[in-house]
Amino acid sequence: MMKASYKQLWKLLVDKEMSKSDLHKATGLSSSTMTKLRRSEDVSMEALRKICTVLDCNIADIVEFEKRDN
């Protein structure tokens, strides 16, 4: 099974000098979606699209999939 990792998103925020709070406000994502991102849980394509629009990037720039150990 594959697990989403948003490490690249957090690195991109640092590069753009944005906080997670800034991202939350700019995208209008719900608090629960932001929590899912912090926990590396699955989020909707719509949420990823909003993030990419705000950060002017592609999905591959903010998320990667890693194998889960079972």
Where are these regions (language model features)?
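Hydrophobic micro-packing sites on short alpha-helices
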Residues: L48-C52, I62-V63
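Short C-terminal boundary/hinge segments that cap the last helix of small helical domains
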Residues: D56-N70
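Amphipathic, hydrophobic secondary-structure cores in small proteins
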Residues: T33-R49
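The alpha-helix within a helix-turn-helix
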Residues: L13, H24, R38, C52
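Residue-level detection of the helix-turn-helix DNA-binding "recognition helix"
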Residues: V14, G28, R39, K67
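A short, Lys/Arg-rich alpha-helix, primarily the initiator
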Residues: M1-S19
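Short alpha-helical DNA-recognition segment
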Residues: E17-T35
